Amino acid sequence: MRCLPVFVILLLLIASAPGVDVQPKTKYYVPRASRRDFAKKTPKRLSKLRGCCPRSFLCCR
């Protein structure tokens, strides 16, 4: 029964803690959707830079 008051106090402290993001959004933060779009656009950019070649698997997509 000694642990019950300590447990209640800990619950009250946790409940009153502010809801703050642990990891702040910095200039390096990239959402997952942007990563997917970047992965789709990269082969197109490479094919435009090098021109279309039949031996490369990244060309002409």
Curated annotation (Swiss-Prot):
One Pfam family, short name please? Chi-conotoxin
| Subcellular location per the Swiss-Prot or TrEMBL entry | Secreted
Disulfide bond found in the keyword field: yes
Keywords attached to this Swiss-Prot or TrEMBL record, sorted alphabetically, are: Disulfide bond, Neurotoxin, Secreted, Signal, Toxin
Expressing tissues: Expressed by the venom duct.
Give a short account of its post-translational modification: Contains 2 disulfide bonds that can be either 'C1-C3, C2-C4' or 'C1-C4, C2-C3', since these disulfide connectivities have been observed for conotoxins with cysteine framework V (for examples, see AC P0DQQ7 and AC P81755).
Q: Which cysteines are joined by disulfide bonds?
A: none
Establish whether keyword Signal is in the entry. yes
Q: Which family does it belong to?
A: Belongs to the conotoxin T superfamily.
What name is this protein filed under?
Answer: Conotoxin Vn5.3
